[in-house]
Amino acid sequence: MVDKRESYTKEDLLASSRGELFGPQGPQLPAPNMLMMDRVVKMTEDGGKYGKGFVEAELDITPDQWFFGCHFIGDPVMPGCLGLDAMWQLVGFYLGWLGGEGKGRALGVGEVKFSGQVLPTAKKVTYRIHFKRVINRRLVMGIADGEVLVDGQHIYAADELKVGLFKDASSF
């Protein structure tokens, strides 16, 4: 039985990274440092811009986060690819929440637009994922649009985020 709540704590997300939240066959989130969210604040099966599912998650920002120390020295900024990866992570998490089984793999993205950045002075990053389609056949796949906000300001968007679940990812 899938643990299908509307919100999840950091402890829940860490359980997902160990394969304990959605069962042994369900998709896992990555472990820290690559886990790019601290909590999921809302999940619905029929919400979002397209009425086909919605996820909202948050990451608390502190100046001592690992990426600020190396990207870039003297000009610290969160790499945009980490925000993109967070959106893929959330698409896979949603597929597990729906009961999908397999190992999650990012399959692509249509277009990504950056219009801002995450600096060490920021307090919170918010991710919003709007599902366009979920395919639940031999291949389980989610297709969604996503947006990233920092302290309430929209800073980037991605369309056509695609994540698939694979029973055997060795041949992927």
Swiss-Prot record:
Subcellular localization: Cytoplasm
One GO cellular component term: cytoplasm
Active site as annotated: H71
Gene that encodes the chain: fabA
Taxonomic source organism: Pectobacterium atrosepticum (strain SCRI 1043 / ATCC BAA-672)
Protein name per UniProt: 3-hydroxydecanoyl-[acyl-carrier-protein] dehydratase
GO BP term (any one): unsaturated fatty acid biosynthetic process
Gene3D superfamilies, sorted: Hotdog Thioesterase
Keywords: Cytoplasm, Fatty acid biosynthesis, Fatty acid metabolism, Isomerase, Lipid biosynthesis, Lipid metabolism, Lyase
GO molecular function (one): trans-2-decenoyl-acyl-carrier-protein isomerase activity
Similarity section: Belongs to the thioester dehydratase family. FabA subfamily.
Record's function text: Necessary for the introduction of cis unsaturation into fatty acids. Catalyzes the dehydration of (3R)-3-hydroxydecanoyl-ACP to E-(2)-decenoyl-ACP and then its isomerization to Z-(3)-decenoyl-ACP. Can catalyze the dehydratase reaction for beta-hydroxyacyl-ACPs with saturated chain lengths up to 16:0, being most active on intermediate chain length.
Enzyme nomenclature, EC number: 4.2.1.59, 5.3.3.14
Self-association state and partner proteins as the record states: Homodimer.
Pathway this chain belongs to: Lipid metabolism; fatty acid biosynthesis
Chief location bin: cytoplasm
The reaction(s) this protein catalyses: a (3R)-hydroxyacyl-[ACP] = a (2E)-enoyl-[ACP] + H2O; (3R)-hydroxydecanoyl-[ACP] = (2E)-decenoyl-[ACP] + H2O; (2E)-decenoyl-[ACP] = (3Z)-decenoyl-[ACP]
Annotated Pfam families: FabA
